[in-house]
UniProtKB/Swiss-Prot annotation:
Underlying gene: mauB
BP terms from Gene Ontology: methylamine metabolic process
Protein name (Swiss-Prot/TrEMBL): Methylamine dehydrogenase heavy chain
Region (Disordered): 32-64
Reactions catalysed: 2 oxidized [amicyanin] + methylamine + H2O = 2 reduced [amicyanin] + formaldehyde + NH4(+) + 2 H(+)
Main location: periplasm
Record-listed E.C. numbers: 1.4.9.1
Major enzyme class: oxidoreductase
Family recorded in the similarity comment: Belongs to the aromatic amine dehydrogenase heavy chain family.
Keyword field: Disulfide bond, Electron transport, Oxidoreductase, Periplasm, Signal, Transport
Gene Ontology MF terms: aliphatic amine dehydrogenase activity; methylamine dehydrogenase (amicyanin) activity
Subcellular location: Periplasm
Organism of origin: Paracoccus versutus
Coiled coil (UniProt feature): none
């Protein structure tokens, strides 16, 4: 008997197991879609809606429609036109070679769709909602082999690619995704990306012509803050900003005044409003520097403190990944904070302080109720506060004025970190 069992071909064993699993799945499906007293599809969906995720509700509605004979052909839906509350969640997936970006309606918490990306993709979104895009990297054999860097531009309604632009010589700086290492120019005509090696440079991608344009030699400075179609700023090691003008085919670099000292260490994720030119940059201790960037120059504002002297003495500090958000219409700053040891600035936080950017006055201190890594705000008159947990892969959505949690969206990949929005309201 033992020899007979051992001689059973492995493929027959696998086929038998597969058929058994299929039969079990079919029985479960019949149990779900053939109730003793059938209900109309709409009634079934309504009855099952409580306690279900968006995906579960959609699956139940589709199953009911199929059972009623109302739908038997696949349908590819289109997303509604973008608004100021649409939010993009980029999941670098802990340095995985294949990644995802989730597109969510912040008003409802509904996932509208997803796009795929490669290694350490960098997302951008046109402020007017006309497109969203990413700079990304893929390899010939998934995680090895020939490397290709490219920029992919997506239609915001169909999510289909409308441009796929290869970057010569694989020039992208592959680093944990920092929000402002890539940027769109204010006219949406060019995407700017950073090159680290063999020498510092900024690449220009012509989105209208759907082609790579050129590399601009820049000093050893970081981040890209566009102030006009041909002028952007970068942060330099001496505490100044480099103003880079690349009009007329030439690159001219000048430096602003030094705006912070050597021991005033800036976090890696400032907030920047492409529409107003406001740069908001906290330090590790919660001191916030601000500048207004224009094509002509930079104007620095008096620094403000996000935390009180008592809070700093009690080890309150900023922390997280994307720690800072700025709301243009209300001129308010949002900063992730918590009690933490020094040099723990990348650890998640449970609180957000809300500040008047003009006066430095604290407006609110919101207890989030979750360990949060990244924040952003919708750029409408009554903004939502988006708070993202990489650990639980969940986006929590709050009323930015009251701090009340309104809804949440879970199952967002493996380690989501970056939150991007459109600033399309007046």
């Amino acid at each position: 008997m033992a020899s007979a069992r051992e001689s059973t071909p492995r493929y027959l064993t696998l086929i038998g197991a597969t058929l058994a699993c299929s039969a079990l799945a079919l029985g479960a499906a019949q149990a779900q879609t053939e109730p003793a007293e059938p209900e109309a599809p709409a009634e079934t969906a309504a009855a099952d809606a409580a306690g279900q995720t968006e995906g579960q509700r959609g699956a139940a509605e589709a199953a009911a429609a199929l059972a009623a004979g109302e739908a038997d052909e696949p349908v590819i839906l289109e997303a509604p036109a973008p608004d100021a509350r649409r939010v993009y969640i980029q999941d670098p997936a802990h340095f995985a070679a294949i990644t995802q970006q989730f597109v969510i309606d912040g008003s409802t918490g509904r996932i509208l769709g997803m796009t795929d990306g490669g290694f350490l993709p960098h997302p951008v979104a046109a402020e007017d909602g006309s497109f969203f895009a990413q700079a990304s990297t893929v390899f010939e054999r998934i995680a090895r082999g020939k490397r290709t860097d490219y920029v992919e531009v997506f239609d915001p309604v169909t999510f289909l690619p409308i441009a796929d632009i290869e970057l010569p010589d694989a020039p992208r700086f592959l680093v944990g995704t920092y929000q402002w290492m890539n940027a769109l120019t204010p006219d949406n005509k060019n995407l700017l990306f950073y090159q680290f090696s063999p020498a510092p440079a900024v690449g220009v991608v012509d989105l209208e012509g759907k082609t790579f344009d050129r590399m601009l030699d820049v000093p050893d400075c970081y981040h890209i803050f566009p102030a006009s179609p041909t002028v952007f700023y970068m942060n330099c090691r001496d505490g100044s900003l480099a103003r880079v003008d690349f009009a007329d085919g030439e690159t001219k670099v000048t430096n602003t005044e030094v705006f912070h000292t050597e021991d005033e260490l800036l976090i890696n994720h400032p907030a920047f409003s492409l529409r107003s030119g406001r740069l908001v940059w906290p330090t590790y201790t919660g001191k916030i520097f601000q500048a207004d960037l224009t094509a002509e120059g930079a104007t620095f504002r008096a620094p403000i403190e996000a935390l009180t002297e008592a809070e700093r003495a009690d080890d309150w500090r900023p922390g997280g990944w994307q720690q800072t958000a700025y709301h243009r219409q209300s001129d308010r700053i949002y900063l992730l904070v918590d009690q933490r040891d020094e040099w723990k600035h990348k650890a998640a936080s449970r609180f957000v302080v809300v500040l008047n950017a003009e006066t430095g006055e604290r407006i609110n201190k919101i207890e989030l109720g979750h360990e949060i890594d990244s924040i952003n705000v919708s750029q409408d008159a009554e903004p939502l506060l988006y708070a993202l947990s990489a650990g639980t892969q969940t986006l929590h959505i709050y009323d930015a004025a009251t701090g009340e949690e309104l809804r949440s969206v879970d199952q967002l990949g493996r380690g989501p970190q970056i939150i991007t929005t459109h600033d399309m309201d007046s």
